């Protein structure tokens, strides 16, 4: 698994509302969350497909 996918979900400290996806280690799935627009980490993907490709999720 890509190391970025092991990072915790970080919403960020700003107040924007960008729909993003992150890899949830517990469920082993990519899940939607709302990103605030600043801060955060590399476990933050624009699309479900990108998250699944990078994190190796198998359907």
UniProtKB/Swiss-Prot annotation:
Annotated PROSITE patterns: BPTI_KUNITZ_1 (PS00280), BPTI_KUNITZ_2 (PS50279)
Site feature (Reactive bond for trypsin) residues: 15-16
Keyword entries, A-Z: Disulfide bond, Ion channel impairing toxin, Nematocyst, Potassium channel impairing toxin, Protease inhibitor, Secreted, Serine protease inhibitor, Toxin, Voltage-gated potassium channel impairing toxin
Cellular compartments annotated: Secreted; Nematocyst
Superkingdom per UniProt: Eukaryota
A GO cellular component annotation in the UniProt record: extracellular region
The protein's name: KappaPI-actitoxin-Avd3d
Organism: Anemonia sulcata
